[in-house]
Structure formats: structure tokens, C-alpha cells
């Protein structure tokens, strides 16, 4: 029963899907929902796939993919790309650590954040459009899973830059190998039914490598990770996966 509660809480935390269930959880136990982030990715990928099937016969591929990317942000409340924008505003402000963290917390978008947001949206549309039509559904299903698993991986290898403040701070420094192992097994088990395991492992390995580099670089700059930088990790991991899918032929 506890695991079901954590799964529902993960869905509520990571999406804007209407789930009218109130769940009480101890703050000290909140980090355990990370194990189920890939299932959130499965649900998002499934919804995007159905959306693609519904639109593909009525619009050009470019227009369909524009709708897909836009809808993906509607499903998540744009929380990850907002984190990407805030991260770029902070990291490229040329300020000290405390000032960078303050800038990331500011709800206003700066030039660097706007550029990061625009480039991410454009690149996602571009690579989705250029993925082989035969594996488009595969890419739509798998990419959100990789993005969420990358968040879990990043939380496992870093600590909180804010000393445990914020929702990200409830998990950073607490998510360990157990949570990542569960998330990893869920991801592998799901992918087994969608594409060849060897292909998934290659794409996942590249995405996790990018996640490692990004997470360590950010940690070097601000002393750890935040909820915003975890959002950036998700976006960059998803973009990496899409780039890989462009070169895949199944």
C-alpha cells in the first residue's frame, strides 16, 4: 500500500494530471517517490504517443511535433523547462554562488533563460521531426522515461546546494542506490517491450553520461543541485535521447 501511495504522489509531484487524492507523507520519507519517476515517464510517453496517433494523419509532421512538444509541457506544468531557464539565468550570470542561487529562485526570466528555453523547444521539435517515422512512437514512449531516470541518477550522485531547502532538497542527498536501482529496473523492464534492449542501453548510457557531466559541472559552480537544476537535467537528458533516436534505425 505504501508503494502505491508513493507512486500516486510521484504522479502528482511530477505532472499536472488531475489526481484528486490527498496523500499524507512524512518529509523524511518523501525522497522514496523518486523510485517511481520512470513510471511517470511511461504515463507521459503513453499520452504523447496517443496524441501523436490522433494528429499525424491531419497535419504535417512539423506541426504535429510542435503540438507534441507543447503538450508535453502542458502535462508537466512546464516545470522542467522552467528549471532549465532558471538554471541558465543563474549559471551564466557571472555572479558568485549565493547570487546564482538567488537568481535561480527569482521568478522573472532573464535573457539567458529565454534563450535556453527557445533553443530547447526548437531543438526538440527539430529532432522529433527528423526521427524515422517507423520509430517515432518508440521515441515518444522512451524519451520521457530516460529523462525521469536521469533525474534520479543526478539526485543519487549529488547533494543539495541549498542545504535541504525546497522540494528538491527533500530528495537531494537522500536518494541512494536503492531508489536508483528500482527506477533502473522499471525502466529496463518497460523498454524490453518497446525496443531492443541493446539499443535502449546505448541511448540510456549516453544520456546518463551527459547527466553526470552536467550534474558535476553544476555542483562545481553552486555546490550542489536544486529543483531547478534537476529540471535542466531532465530537459538535457531528453534532448540527448532524441538526438540518439535520430541516428537509430530499427
From Swiss-Prot:
Cellular component per GO, a single term: plasma membrane
GO molecular function per UniProt: adenosylcobinamide-GDP ribazoletransferase activity; cobalamin 5'-phosphate synthase activity
Superkingdom in the source lineage: Bacteria
Keyword Secreted: no
Cellular compartment(s): Cell membrane
Keywords: Cell membrane, Cobalamin biosynthesis, Magnesium, Membrane, Transferase, Transmembrane, Transmembrane helix
Family membership noted in the UniProt record: Belongs to the CobS family.
Name of protein: Adenosylcobinamide-GDP ribazoletransferase
Amino acid at each position: 500500500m505504501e508503494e502505491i501511495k508513493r507512486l500516486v504522489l510521484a504522479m502528482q509531484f511530477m505532472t499536472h494530471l488531475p489526481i484528486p487524492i490527498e496523500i499524507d507523507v512524512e518529509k523524511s520519507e518523501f525522497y522514496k517517490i523518486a523510485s517511481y519517476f520512470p513510471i511517470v515517464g511511461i504515463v507521459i510517453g503513453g499520452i504523447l504517443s496517443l496524441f501523436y496517433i490522433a494528429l499525424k494523419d491531419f497535419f504535417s509532421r512539423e506541426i504535429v511535433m510542435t503540438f507534441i512538444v507543447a503538450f508535453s509541457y502542458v502535462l508537466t506544468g512546464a516545470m522542467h523547462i522552467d528549471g532549465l531557464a532558471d538554471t541558465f539565468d543563474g549559471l551564466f550570470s557571472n555572479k558568485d554562488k549565493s547570487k546564482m542561487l538567488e537568481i535561480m529562485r527569482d521568478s522573472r526570466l532573464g535573457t539567458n533563460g529565454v534563450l535556453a528555453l527557445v533553443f530547447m523547444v526548437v531543438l526538440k521539435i527539430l529532432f522529433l521531426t527528423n526521427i524515422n517515422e517507423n520509430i517515432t512512437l518508440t521515441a515518444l514512449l522512451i524519451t520521457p522515461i530516460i529523462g525521469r531516470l536521469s533525474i534520479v541518477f543526478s539526485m543519487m550522485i549529488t547533494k543539495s546546494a541549498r542545504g535541504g531547502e525546497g522540494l528538491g532538497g527533500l530528495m537531494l542527498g537522500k536518494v541512494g542506490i536503492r531508489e536508483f536501482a528500482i527506477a533502473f529496473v522499471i525502466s529496463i523492464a518497460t523498454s524490453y517491450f518497446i525496443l531492443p534492449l541493446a539499443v535502449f542501453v546505448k541511448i540510456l548510457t549516453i544520456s546518463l553520461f551527459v547527466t553526470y557531466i552536467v550534474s558535476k559541472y553544476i555542483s562545481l559552480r553552486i555546490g550542489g543541485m536544486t529543483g531547478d537544476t534537476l529540471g535542466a537535467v531532465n530537459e538535457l537528458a531528453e534532448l540527448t535521447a532524441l538526438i540518439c533516436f535520430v541516428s537509430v534505425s530499427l
